UniProtKB/Swiss-Prot annotation:
Pfam family, one: Toxin_3
CDD domains: neurotoxins_LC_scorpion
Protein name: Lipolysis-activating peptide 1-alpha chain
GO molecular function, one term: sodium channel inhibitor activity
The keyword Disulfide bond is assigned to this record: yes
Signal peptide (residue range): 1-21
Record-annotated LCN-type CS-alpha/beta domain positions: 23-87
Protein's organism: Lychas mucronatus (Chinese swimming scorpion)
Gene3D superfamilies noted in UniProt: Knottin, scorpion toxin-like (3.30.30.10)
Tissue-specific expression: Expressed by the venom gland.
Function: The heterodimer LVP1 induces lipolysis in rat adipocytes. Induction of lipolysis by LVP1 appears to be mediated through the beta-2 adrenergic receptor pathway (ADRB2).
Keyword vocabulary terms for this entry: Disulfide bond, G-protein coupled receptor impairing toxin, Ion channel impairing toxin, Neurotoxin, Secreted, Signal, Toxin
Family note: Belongs to the long (3 C-C) scorpion toxin superfamily.
Length: 91
C-alpha cells in the first residue's frame, strides 16, 4: 500500500511541475525586453544556445518560450548576463 501511495504522489508531483529540490529556473529576456520565442517544444538547440548566452547549461522550450533551468534573477536580462560573463566588453 505504501509503495502505491508513494508512486501515485511521485507521478502527481511530476505532472504538476513541482520541484522538490528547489532548483528553479527562469525565462530569459532578450535585448529588447521580450522573452525568447520558440516553436519546437522540449529540448532544442535554439533554447540551449539562449540559455548558454545567459550563463546556464540547460534549457528547453516550455509554453513556446525558452526556459532556462537554474537561471538566477540577476542573469534574466541579456545585458546583465553579458556584463557578468563577458569581462572584456565595454558596455
Amino acid at each position: 500500500m505504501n509503495i502505491k501511495l508513494f508512486c501515485f504522489l511521485s507521478i502527481l508531483i511530476s505532472l504538476t511541475g513541482l520541484s522538490l529540490s528547489g532548483d528553479d529556473g527562469n525565462y530569459p529576456i532578450d535585448a529588447n525586453g521580450n522573452r525568447y520565442s520558440c516553436g519546437k517544444l522540449g529540448e532544442n538547440e535554439f533554447c540551449l544556445k539562449v540559455c548558454k548566452l545567459h550563463g546556464v547549461k540547460r534549457g528547453y522550450c516550455y509554453f513556446f518560450k525558452c526556459y532556462c533551468e537554474l537561471l538566477k534573477d540577476k542573469d534574466i536580462q541579456f545585458f546583465d548576463a553579458y556584463k557578468t560573463y563577458c569581462k572584456n566588453s565595454r558596455i
